[in-house]
Amino acid sequence: MPQLDTSTWFTTILSTSFSIIHRLQLKLTTHIFSPNPTPKDLKTLKHHNPWDKKWTKSYLPLSLHQH
């Protein structure tokens, strides 16, 4: 039964991890961060949906009263 050749695994793992770290650094350096973050008012974040003003009730078929 032939043995598994693991002589190149160290090089492969090392180069892969180096590549992942390098790409992560590139992503972080090109990302634009806000220079002066300020808290937002929570009231301005409310979305107005058309169904908010309506009262609706949905019934499941098994929850109906059976007489």
UniProtKB/Swiss-Prot annotation:
N6-succinyllysine found at: 54
Listed InterPro entries: ATP8_mammal, ATP8_metazoa
Regions that span the bilayer: 8-24
Keyword field: Acetylation, ATP synthesis, CF(0), Hydrogen ion transport, Ion transport, Membrane, Mitochondrion, Transmembrane, Transmembrane helix, Transport
Keyword Transmembrane attached: yes
GO biological process, one term: proton motive force-driven ATP synthesis
GO CC term (a single one): mitochondrial membrane
Example GO molecular function: proton transmembrane transporter activity
Keyword Ion transport carried by entry: yes
Signal peptide region: none
Modified residues (N6-acetyllysine): 54, 57
A Pfam family hit: ATP-synt_8
Mode of membrane association: Single-pass membrane protein
Protein's cellular compartments: Mitochondrion membrane
Family statement drawn from the similarity comment of this UniProt entry: Belongs to the ATPase protein 8 family.
Job of this protein: Subunit 8, of the mitochondrial membrane ATP synthase complex (F(1)F(0) ATP synthase or Complex V) that produces ATP from ADP in the presence of a proton gradient across the membrane which is generated by electron transport complexes of the respiratory chain. ATP synthase complex consist of a soluble F(1) head domain - the catalytic core - and a membrane F(1) domain - the membrane proton channel. These two domains are linked by a central stalk rotating inside the F(1) region and a stationary peripheral stalk.
Subunit structure: Component of the ATP synthase complex composed at least of ATP5F1A/subunit alpha, ATP5F1B/subunit beta, ATP5MC1/subunit c (homooctomer), MT-ATP6/subunit a, MT-ATP8/subunit 8, ATP5ME/subunit e, ATP5MF/subunit f, ATP5MG/subunit g, ATP5MK/subunit k, ATP5MJ/subunit j, ATP5F1C/subunit gamma, ATP5F1D/subunit delta, ATP5F1E/subunit epsilon, ATP5PF/subunit F6, ATP5PB/subunit b, ATP5PD/subunit d, ATP5PO/subunit OSCP.
Stated name of the protein: ATP synthase F(0) complex subunit 8
The species this protein was found in: Glis glis (Fat dormouse)
Gene: MT-ATP8
